[in-house]
Amino acid sequence: NKPVQYITGETYFYNDKFLTPPGVFIPRPETELLVDCAVEFLSKSKDNLRIIDFCTGSGCILLSIAKKFPNHEYIGIDKSEIAIKTAKKNRKLLGLKNVQFFNQDIFKYNQSKGDLLMCNPPYLSNHEIENLEQSVKENDPLSALTDFKNGTSFYKHLISNFNKLVKKNGIMLLEIPFS
């Protein structure tokens, strides 16, 4: 029942290969829409913007954008050490220099604001976790899937702290569940 991405240690996202060892969330194809939205915003923007990606995981979202728009500053934040180590390896594989990754809890983040803040947070409720496919529960890191509550704590934090996290005229892009 192990996903092929954990067997091979890699997956494709937005036309690039990314390392995805066990313990790091496997990016889903629908998350590429978040990249598309960021690309649309950045294609109409000036250079030298700061793009921040909370819950960065393997770094695939941030790195996919940085590859298309190299004239910006990119910061990826994740509380998982293995995710940050993997994101740094993925950065090296793609040959990108303008991307930094930090091991930090987003609830304690108080550094610089972003012109673009992105996040694909853990959004499943405890009830939804109970009903997930067994292979997902056994293989994906649960902390990347759920806040171990009702699935809204990350959204509440990001929205209530918008002015502390996002610069004036900046935007926030969030992946939200279908439900």
Predicted regions and their residues:
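Residue-level signal for inorganic ion chemistry
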Residues: 1, 31, 61, 87, ...
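Conserved AdoMet
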Residues: 1-41
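Active-site beta-alpha loop architecture of Rossmann-like, nucleotide-cofactor-dependent enzymes
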Residues: 5, 124-127, 179
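Short loop/edge segments at beta-strand edges and connector loops
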Residues: 8, 102-104, 176
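Conserved SAM/SAH cofactor-binding pocket of Class I
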Residues: 33-131
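Class I S-adenosylmethionine-dependent transferase superfamily signal
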Residues: 38, 65, 136, 158-162
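Mobile active-site "lid"/loop adjacent to the S-adenosyl-L-methionine
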Residues: 123-154
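Conserved Class I SAM-dependent methyltransferase catalytic core
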Residues: 149-179
